[in-house]
Amino acid sequence: MAQVAKKILVTCALPYANGSIHLGHMLEHIQADIWVRFQRMRGNQVHFICADDAHGTPIMLKAQQLGIEPEQMIAEMSQEHQQDFAGFAISYDNYHSTHSDENRELSSLIYSRLKANGYIKNRTISQLYDPEKGMFLPDRFVKGTCPKCKSPDQYGDNCEVCGATYSPTELIDPKSAVSGATPVMRESEHFFFDLPAFSDMLQAWTRSGALQEQVANKMQEWFESGLQQWDISRDAPYFGFEIPDAPGKYFYVWLDAPIGYMGAFKNLCDKRGDLDFDEFWRKDSEADLYHFIGKDIVYFHSLFWPAMLEGSNFRKPTNLFVHGYVTVNGAKMSKSRGTFIKAGTYLKHLDADCLRYYYAAKLSSRIDDIDLNLEDFVQRVNADIVNKVVNLASRNAGFINKRFAGKLADHLADPALYKTFTDAATSIADAYSNRESSKAIREIMALADIANRYVDEQAPWVVAKEEGRDADLQAICSMGINLFRVLMTYLKPVLPALTERTEAFLNTELTWDSIEQPLLGHQINAFKALFNRIDVDKVNEMVASSKEDMAAAVAVTGPLADDPIQETISFDDFAKVDMRIALIQQADFVEGSDKLLKLKLDLGGETRQVFSGIRSAYPDPKVLEGRLTVMVANLAPRKMRFGISEGMVMAAGPGGKDIFLLSPDNGAQPGMQVK
């Protein structure tokens, strides 16, 4: 009896729309795509969707920095993301955005149902507020000194030096990462999702046996420490969806982000017309729903998301498929080393199938980190795909094309060997189905070794020279081609581009069920190179290009872009400049000038008068009095209509309000020379 086709909805975590896709992201999308392609080969009805996560403070602020509207920025980023995923042959049925009408409607619907069911609580909270920008600050937008280890320049939620976690209000000398201002405490009414109300349901889901053991164990730790109500609101200004009947309040990005899965599918349903949204999302849905995610967002997907769905009368996920991080050459991806590689940069230098294969050869169903060792990457791809698989076709196709006009023999030379290959279909299918692609690859490569050993032993290049053995030659080479066909059928979920070229060469589609019948008396096409070896130089160029990419990115966003470093001077030229520490004794407005301040500077025994164009940044000049600064002391006096300026104080910044007077470190005294 034929197996009934399953209806499956598969998602990947939504990439954030404020940055490019890199090879760390690609692990998840490749893993999911391999699984989806396998399920489709097995006859299941799979809908594969994703979207850009397009809301939140970081996107709002980055758009401001770029001088464009957030809508323009996320549209441009979506185009780049989709181009990268297409380059890696990720077979999405729909790629959407959380900033969509569908997502707005569904977010409002879910919120309204949660509120009607008593799961939304209101309470007033105190949080840090940036008085210059007029906005409440997320934890990651507050920086200061760690209250535990006293390390400076740490985020408002955890210390990257000692690992401590804390509230942003505990930071020593906190500053807004947006404006540099000292934040103040302000109260605001926020809306909370009552997550603890779903504790029993979530614990039962955890114990159901569906989740990965590592995920279930981690969830148990969270249950033991106690679930907390979840703040789902943010105050204006915020780029996102305004909460119904709550002017100036917006849904927190992590509320509408997972709803983006639903929004992307709803958009697909509306486009197609033959899909029923409710069939996949209603409470009693019999369809399967799987989320591929990284281990860093398990908390949201294993607790908040199923609870939100339960509380709003939608179905829960069938399962979460969680993976680890990507390291490169045994270390965290590094911009300085060129191992922080963007997907687009990779595609300019290498074939997407190479990375797909390497990740597949390392992935399992466990939440283990994957190391992309670039040397091993080159060796494994060349050894496995080129030397073992593609070489099997090239060793045999030449004889078939030249001696037999491209026609395969009408019988198998070794039916028992062929059956060994087709019998492996069950265990390889089980491996793919269970997301054990590394196990599948090991089995496939073991078969490839057997196939090549068969060709070595039969030695068609010797048979070709012997009189009267044409039939043997055709049978041997046809056997090799048929074994190649089986191998490529098993590799089809992993290597879509190579599969397409292989199908053109073999003049047949590769399907899982068709391998039971070998190609007999079949016409193949002329053999053309199916796959190129990885050139180490190309990998090195990619790494070098990644360094250049990051250098360019820094230049674009940093002050150097607008104010490049000037021509090199000699040390003797620099030595002529005499810079000294100066104490600002007095600072006053200059009558008749809206740009200048008049400063009286003490150099430790000598007093100077200096006119400085810093008034726009210091509207109250008295705040400068008593402060140490740096001045050029041997600059020739300059006669101005307001008086004589006897030097120059040092400041940084582009101008206007963004002028920053330089100050020396503690211990410096007036008159000291700066060297």
From Swiss-Prot:
Zn(2+) binds at residues 146, 149, 159, 162. Its EC number is 6.1.1.10. Coiled coil: none annotated. CDD domains: Anticodon_Ia_Met (cd07957), MetRS_core (cd00814), tRNA_bind_EcMetRS_like (cd02800). It comes from the Bacteria. SUPFAM superfamilies: Anticodon-binding domain of a subclass of class I aminoacyl-tRNA synthetases, Methionyl-tRNA synthetase (MetRS), Zn-domain, Nucleic acid-binding proteins, Nucleotidylyl transferase. Keywords: Aminoacyl-tRNA synthetase, ATP-binding, Cytoplasm, Ligase, Metal-binding, Nucleotide-binding, Protein biosynthesis, RNA-binding, tRNA-binding, Zinc. Binds 1 zinc ion per subunit. One of its GO terms (cellular component) is cytosol. GO terms for molecular function: ATP binding; metal ion binding; methionine-tRNA ligase activity; tRNA binding. Residues 573-675 form the tRNA-binding domain. Is required not only for elongation of protein synthesis but also for the initiation of all mRNA translation through initiator tRNA(fMet) aminoacylation. Homodimer. This is Methionine--tRNA ligase. It comes from Yersinia enterocolitica serotype O:8 / biotype 1B (strain NCTC 13174 / 8081). The gene is metG.
